[in-house]
């Protein structure tokens, strides 16, 4: 989008200059509210169209997908195009990455994990733990990188201690800080 601004030079001459204008999220929302009977539907459809342009095959509202996409963008990784396999790869496609996220004050959860499917950890080179702001759950405040071998060792310890009915293991922020390195802040 372009607009015109008036500028005054040193001789008090007024000139108009064409400039590129980028609106922020609040301005975009105000515009959409003015021009749509159903702003929510338009916003979701727009994000879905953007997702499709990027080549993603999975449903926009698949749990975890938007944060995985966001983390991959922040770290310069290639986000998976389907829900199968690792969450992302490096630019060359030679390393697989898994992303875990939580809000500040929570713990990073690895769901549906047990002795029989440790390949979900082993297929990865690294894990990235993304911490989101407690008040604004869309704002990623910090990301740590942890080698998959370290995550696997901890997962085996946790699995050995957990009840048969539980298939979720958690990693505390303290564990991540101790075992990882900050790659985004």
For the regions a protein language model found, what residue spans apply to each?
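Nucleic-acid endonuclease domains
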Residues: 2-185
């Amino acid at each position: 989008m372009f607009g015109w601004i008036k500028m005054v030079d040193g001789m008090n001459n007024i000139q108009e200059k064409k400039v590129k204008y980028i609106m922020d999220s609040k301005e975009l929302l105000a515009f959409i509210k003015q021009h749509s009977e159903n702003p929510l539907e338009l916003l979701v459809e727009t994000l879905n169209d953007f997702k499709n342009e990027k080549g993603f095959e999975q449903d926009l509202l698949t749990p975890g997908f938007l944060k995985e996409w966001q983390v991959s963008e922040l770290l310069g990784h290639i986000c998976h195009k389907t829900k199968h396999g690792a969450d992302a790869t490096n630019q060359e496609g030679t390393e697989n990455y898994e992303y875990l996220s939580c809000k500040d004050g929570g713990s990073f959860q690895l769901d549906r994990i047990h002795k029989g499917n440790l390949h979900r950890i082993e297929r990865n080179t690294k894990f990235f733990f993304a911490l989101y702001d407690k008040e604004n759950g869309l704002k990623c405040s910090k990301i740590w990188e942890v080698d998959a071998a370290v995550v696997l060792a901890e997962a085996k310890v946790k699995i050995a201690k957990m009840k048969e009915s539980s298939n979720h293991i958690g990693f505390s922020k303290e564990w991540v800080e101790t075992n990882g390195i900050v790659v985004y802040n």
